[in-house]
């Protein structure tokens, strides 16, 4: 029997204490606070951080009474940044705020200063967004991305529940998976390499770090069937990672857009998600495109699917919709495109209604800002709901 041809593909993740992810979470916590009191809030909130300082800035038009400084400190504290030696002290760091109103030029073009009906609301900006799905995992997400993301989440879990008390908030993960290409569908064979770099305190040895990471992080996350004697482990390969968080590196909202999406699979239009209200199609367009791609794969029409949608500022209807099933479709892609167009409304105002995207509060968007926006469980992730598709099945 001929040996199966394989290839390697790698995805990375960072956990919630990474400086860029800290910024994503603060930006989305601000969005949550605005939407909780005023669902029509227009929010474009950026965050940056460096040693002993967090700044939030951008354009926000809202009736909500928002205490920006409290949101910053609460978010940092929730992640675990409670003293300078872990990278940031939530209660004593400088918090700078520079927020202005949304430009009236943008407001009149997008929502007519709140006068337009939902179906008339224009895209908040130009751009193109992608949604992707694959049948290789129950989440309809790439395995390399799922494992890297879950390792990051598990690192945080064992830090917060004190299983590994030497852990500090900052950390990164990376997983290389060996795949077989089955006529366009991706079939994971094994995990080739696992890389974890995590911030730690002064007391722990590198041997203890490696042993704890294998036992408490890798074992519970990566299914046994994917690990073998040839799997390579790089556990804190730099040898020392005591200084971390904003003390180690500056952080900025929107710097982790591949981690937020599909781990390098599919494609990305370049627009970040966090800190943006749903009239920003960077966010809402990517969410509806994911629902469309996932619904196609979950319905069995294709094993793998990417959907692209594009917009012009102020125009409700998308400029283009594109579908590619990588040769895995049971019917031609042009027919699948028609199914997508018939079953999904890509106008921003209608996406907002159909996915209930004005609902903030209860940390809804904050939850999305670490460990990925897609392949997640829970009622808040409305774009992960598989939509039953109306289509004429070909007769056998």
UniProtKB/Swiss-Prot annotation:
The residues that hold ATP are: 18, 170-172, 238-241, 249, 255-256, 272, 276, 280
Keyword hit for Transferase: yes
Gene Ontology BP terms: one-carbon metabolic process; S-adenosylmethionine biosynthetic process
Q: Which UniProt keywords apply?
A: ATP-binding, Cobalt, Cytoplasm, Magnesium, Metal-binding, Nucleotide-binding, One-carbon metabolism, Potassium, Transferase
Q: Which cofactor does it need?
A: Mn(2+); Mg(2+); Co(2+); K(+)
Hey, which family's this protein in? Answer: Belongs to the AdoMet synthase family.
The subunit field of the Swiss-Prot or TrEMBL record says: Homotetramer.
| Name of the protein in its database record | S-adenosylmethionine synthase 4
Look up and give the organism this protein is from: Hordeum vulgare (Barley)
Lineage of the organism? Eukaryota, Viridiplantae, Streptophyta, Embryophyta, Tracheophyta
